[in-house]
Every structure is written in C-alpha cells, then in structure tokens.
C-alpha cells in the first residue's frame, strides 16, 4: 500500500482531483499531468465503455471514473510502468477515497482491459 506521504502517491491524487473536477467544469484549464490524460480522453473513455458495458460513463461514480481514466491512460501510454503497479495504485486510491465497492469495480475493469487489450492472461504472476 502506498504511504500518504509518498510524493508519487500525492501526485496521482492530484491528477485524479484534476480529472474529477474536469468532469464538472470542462472549460477549465486542466493542470499538470492531467493534461496528458485529457488529451487522450476519447480513447481512454472508449475502452472504459467497452469493458464496463453495464455502466455507461454518465452512471459511473465521478471519482471511480477519474481513477479509471488515469489508470487506463497509464496502461496505454506508460509502457515502462508495470501494469501491476498501475492496478495496485488505482485500487489503493479507490479504497482510500471511493465507496465500499469502488475498488472492486476499478480492479475488474482494469483487469479486463489488461487481459483483452494487452493480452496478459494471468494477472497474479
């Protein structure tokens, strides 16, 4: 589990806050690393929609969506970062800030994307 004082953890929280806010204020200027995510939002959202078909984006809780957007972006664009790290980060943030079931939803969607899009079958190895 990431420590709250870990600068990388704090950076991810900051990006998620920006993405969360962006959902409600699309005309606002997105700050820092969140700009990269917003630039690829169409592709990221398409994958989330594809692998969470029972949950249209407008029905996904906004915090869960912000967490997923960052994680999916990282899976697609940050190949030097192991996918397990990306999933662990997202799940821990969902546990810390989301609802009781947020982490399960985030983990399920990310696991499916990893299997179907990245071709990785066994996530536990």
Pin down the residues of each PLM region.
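N-terminal interaction/assembly modules
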Residues: 1-97, 103, 109-125
């Amino acid at each position: 589990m990431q420590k709250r004082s870990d600068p990388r953890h704090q950076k991810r929280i900051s990006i998620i806050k920006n993405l969360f806010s962006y959902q409600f204020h699309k005309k606002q200027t997105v700050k820092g690393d969140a700009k990269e995510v917003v630039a690829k939002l169409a592709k990221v959202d398409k994958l989330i929609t594809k692998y969470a078909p029972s949950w249209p984006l407008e029905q996904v809780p906004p915090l869960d969506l912000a967490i997923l957007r960052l994680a999916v972006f990282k899976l697609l664009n940050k190949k030097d970062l192991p996918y397990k790290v990306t999933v662990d980060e997202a799940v821990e943030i969902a546990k810390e800030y989301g609802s009781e079931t947020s982490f399960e939803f985030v983990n399920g969607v990310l696991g499916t994307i990893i299997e179907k899009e990245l071709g990785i079958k066994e996530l536990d190895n």
